[in-house]
Amino acid sequence: MRIEGVVVATVTPFAKDGVNYEGLRALLSKIVEEGYQGVFPTSSTGEVTKLTFEERVKAMEVAKEVAGGRALVVAGTGTGDHLSTIEIARRYRDVGVDVLLITPPYYIQYDWAAVYAFYKRVLDKVDMPVVLYTIPLATGYNIPVEVFELVANEYSQVVGVKDSSGDFRYHLDLIHLLGKRLSVLQGLDLLFVPSLLMGAHGGVLAGPNFLGRITLEQYRLVKEGKTAEAVALHNKLMPLWRFMGGCGLVGKLGGKWPTLYKVATQMVRGIDMGPPREPLPPIDDRDRKELEKLLKDLGLI
């Protein structure tokens, strides 16, 4: 399996009593209709670590109903140990998801041997297409490219690597060492066009929650060799990414980035996103006004 194009890491709409599944269904429907290659509800942007296993499975059931046969349905584990990872993977498999994205172990800064052992324990029990993942913001460490190479050499179900490190030298190593065998996928909107230009196969990105077809247009321009136009569109979005979060997903407002994506999605799509799930904080009026101005400058609202 080769994953190419844009998989959208969707935000999770909440109601007072839990996940707003109808809101999620509406969002997924719009994204699929726009032509994106995949959807990924149980993502970091989707606040996966704050969802119960039941909520995660239900979200993936909705995604399968909406996108099945029209776009890849990708499920994220959001777990930090091998037993929970295997359990949620089996439940996702029963739903019929297309690809499993495995969150690396977090909370403790593990060495490469521990991470390698984690992958072996999981992949010995999980037989479905898998994307490996590095996200130092959440784990406190970056996974050596050589670990991904070892795992991919041993397990044929590994089909890709998602890189949310923000380290472009590291990303180039992934492309150089693994790009002929695996799909190398950029995890940060800010680096999507530069990654494509250097040979990445696509991205797993949150921007399309509210950008409409803009991210697809970036992908098309690069694939058609229209580099100057792709770079111009990339630069047009830079003020937004500087505000919302760029390399490392921190940006101006620190840990509020998932909330920003939800607020932007509600502004553009008109779908009630509800509040972020605690302890994620809301944004204040000043930040809301700045976000609104940036979206207006782009003609999105």
Swiss-Prot record:
A Gene Ontology cellular-component term = cytoplasm
Q: Where is the signal peptide?
A: none
Q: Note the coiled coil stretches, chain numbering.
A: none
Alphabetical keyword list: Cytoplasm, Lyase, Schiff base
Listed EC numbers: 4.-.-.-
* Subunit annotation: Homotetramer.
- Tell me the protein family, please: Belongs to the DapA family.
This one is known as: Uncharacterized DapA-like lyase Tneu_1812
Organism, as annotated: Pyrobaculum neutrophilum (strain DSM 2338 / JCM 9278 / NBRC 100436 / V24Sta)
**Source species taxonomy:** Archaea, Thermoproteota, Thermoprotei, Thermoproteales, Thermoproteaceae
